[in-house]
Curated annotation (Swiss-Prot):
Family: Belongs to the adenylyl cyclase class-4/guanylyl cyclase family.
Disordered: region residues: 825-863
Note: The 1224-5/1F strain is deficient in phototaxis. It is not known if this is due to defective adenylate cyclase activity or defective BLUF domains in this protein.
Oligomer status and interactors: Heterotetramer of two alpha and two beta subunits.
InterPro entries hit by this protein: A/G_cyclase (IPR001054), Acylphosphatase-like_dom_sf (IPR036046), Adenylyl/Guanylyl_Cyclase_3/4 (IPR050697), BLUF_domain (IPR007024), Nucleotide_cyclase (IPR029787)
Name by which UniProt lists this protein: Photoactivated adenylate cyclase subunit alpha-like protein 1224-5/1F
SUPFAM superfamilies reported for this sequence: Acylphosphatase/BLUF domain-like, Nucleotide cyclase, RNI-like
Species, as recorded: Euglena gracilis
Encoding gene, per UniProt annotation: pacA
Main location: other
Domain Guanylate cyclase residue range list: 204-332, 615-744
Cross-referenced PROSITE patterns: BLUF (PS50925), GUANYLATE_CYCLASE_2 (PS50125)
Pfam families: BLUF
Domain BLUF: 55-148, 467-559
Recorded superkingdom: Eukaryota
Amino acid sequence: MYILVWKEGQQIRTFQDLEESVQFRTASNITDGQIFSINVTPTMGKGGETGETQLRRLMYLSASTEPENCNADYVGDMAHFATLRNKSIGVSGFYMYSAPFLFQVIQGTDEDLDFLCANGSADPRHQRCIELADGPTTGRMYGWWHLKDSHIDNITKDPAIKTILIEIARSFSSMWSYLPRNAANMVLLGKNPNKQAPEPMSVVVTVIYLVEFSVIMAHPGLSEQCPDILPAFVDACVPHVDGTGGEVAKFIIAICMAYWPINSDEHALVGLQQLSDDLAELRSLQEDGSARSLIYSRCGLHFGRAMLCNAGFRKADFTLLGDWINSASRITSLSVNSKVPLLLSFLVRCLLGDEMRVELERSGLHKVGGRVKPVQVYQFNAPELDTATVRGEIKQFNPGRERALCPVKPYESLHPAHPDPIFDDTPRENQPELSQVQRRDSLVDRLSQIAKLAFPSSMMAGGEGQLITLTYISQAAHPVSRLDLASIQRIAFARNESSNITKSLLYVSGLFVQTLEGTKGAVVSLYLKNRQDKRHKDVVAAFMAPIDEGVYGSPLDMTSATEEMLATFTPLHDVLSQLAKSFISLETYVPSTVVRHLAAGNNPRNLQPVSVEVVMLATAISSFTPLSEKCSLTEVWTICNTFIVACTSAICNEGGEVIKLIGDCVPAYFPPTNADNAVHACQEIVSFCAQLRAAFHDVLDCRSVVACGVGLDYGQVIMVQCGSLGMTEFVVAGEVRARVLEVEALTREAGRAIVITEPVPERQSPKLRDTGIVPCQEGVDGARCYGILGPEWELDVATIKKNINGFLKDARALAANKKVDDGTNISCRGGNPPAGGIPTSPKVRPPGRTNSVSSYTPDPKQALDPRMAESVFLDMCHQGDTVNNSIAVKLGLAANEDGFDGGWILTWYVELMPVKQAIKVLTQLRIGNMSDNFVDDNNVGELLEKCIPTRSLQVLDLSNNPGLTKVIALKPKHNTQVREILLNGTRIAPTEQRKQQTSKNVNRLCASTDLKGSHKYEH
């Protein structure tokens, strides 16, 4: 791993290889950067049979620079030197060579592996190292050095192993750039991204728009140059986000979503300013007729609490969830009226440092005339960006003699034998049906989808008599004995001979690697039969391609890994298992079109930009905005993940292709001849939501209110690759892509769960068209719309909102009941309970109630023992919330100290109540730190009330809690013995103290200070 450090150590970024780090430094114009080769992978503290600890395993692939010399003697000479060296430093592992690839696994401590990797990276005998796995391991899996007998020809004559090695290299090098960085790192560490818990975080977020891209798409002279415009936009955004410490969340057509850590707000602002300047320079360098002269950007910067999570499993995506997403998009849209390329929210202004804020104020920082409720927006003097002017430039644009570098071609004009596999045209009548139980198994679903990749479009055009080869991997369902293998060999030999098929079968410790050769019809038929064979499971098709002649001369050449063979080369099973796991994870996040193109033996970067007519689908959760604003992030993730899983399964089962996910919205496309399949997918999605509501009807669960609308439209799109080696996206763009979102939104007004535009019924079957649709009164862009007829396809928005409000009300009431049961509701302490016996929730306060605690009287019978803090927290969490062990540990330590460091410990607001109750028993505290948490105007008074028994408390740190806006909430009457309340980084700090700080010795606000005047912002 390589680390690039610049700006005197203030900016750090990691890379997997040296070439990538050098390219990034050059692209980002970093002049003071230094590159270091280090490794920061955590190690495991448990030893294996040998009792060794702190061991790590690194698996990587490289290409030999001199394959003509790599014979058995050459490898033997390498073995002699490597054995002596690696035994001396304590590193074990193995090499496996198949020209031109070197596959290596090494095990040892972090220090030893770092030393060996540093020497290996400078070895001129191999190049282009690709890490396949890097993570902790328990004990040593291999001997000291398995190199001498690891030459591929010494293991087995089976060419399937060579095929597997080639597929590893092609899959990782071609598909890695399509993965989100988070998913790529998890795959590298051997983790399944689908199994990772959501990660809450506070982030500075932006939404960057390519100005008037829809007008560009509609221009007849510009549609051909869209493959030049989109990659230029992607290549411009990536360096300015990555170079300032940010992360690109995703690209959606001509929109870039990115985020930065909370302390990188100034870097984000500088990066977005530089993006606008660089695009202006790019436009000035273009010749007449170049579409790149029309690339403008506008963006908005906002701050909020969000959750980075994985949603879906058949087609999954990492996405950011939070109510700030819509606000950030609205801020960006507000820049159209302001005629500026960049706006920032009030919260971002709060986080700016003194120097940056003064600089912006000198440049005319002021509040925008409009307002994005409930966010105030600011702008500063910048080069004017008039959208109307840009639109005029686009309409008057004349490409002249300029031609696109990679022009868009009609899909029908491609050669019939080699079309791009943009549609899943697998013959579905031959596919085995999955039971309902299997469909709930994410692994089975994903493997079933991957198996379809063995039949790309390019293979379908060769006829049934085309000679092909197919390699696939499967797991044995039950232990296989030697008698079982003998039976398999006898039966398969006769069957393959009758079908004129040659086959190689490699069996290694429960893992089958099989290669079939023969005519396409015979091979595909046999493969489908083997998929239904109950003796093996989890079938993964790794490779399929046409061949001129077969490699095998026998109907069945079977190699069984005997104990002697495994003793000679133990890593064989590990190698193949790692391939299967990595391939599964990669396919989940990479577009199916790209994977099919790769499985057909092609380079995905050579995909031809095409224009094609499709049936476009878009579905989203109804009334998702109030749900996301009022539910916790965990509940929002549960809703989205459940919904997206159902959508992707329904779409893939009907032959559709899922595009990039957009929050709760799932876009997809179908072939123009599959309009009926698209409608069936819509019906399955709506039916799933109805069944989900019924299943949770009697349970207080957020999934009991999930409803959706689905829109279908028909039109032309372009499909093009965007980006470079650092980040690549497969984009589906077009007017229909934007219009289908409006059709989906029309479902609320029409009262129909499924709405389709007029071109779609023309492509439906007569039965479905004549009896299953009804005209809608509304339309989109002049096109008539129809709703699917039937009571089960009706959408009652009023009932949906009523159910959502009822769920939220019941959830608050349940939370209030829990607090009364465990004695945490203090609103009724010392008095009678409210009428009706229903306790008062602190989140649902009667009119006129304030945060004042002047009526508080301590209970003399209540024991307050600091040693009980940890148990109090755990007890409250066990009654409804998930236990955060790090908080429990800190509370346990605070029982024996005079300070509690609770800064940045909460993952969500539901943990605040248990923490406040635990703080109450820490009566010996002198310093309390609750910075960077969820303290706001509604709960700060209650927090101070919990501190009343702590008579020695002198300093309370509430820094970096932007939810604090009212000075009245911190008047001295709440807790008179608190000497100092630290408020730096909040909205009620003095003007000179708004910069986020980490020190508790600066920017303090004393409780005895007059809290008027300068302690408020001059809005």
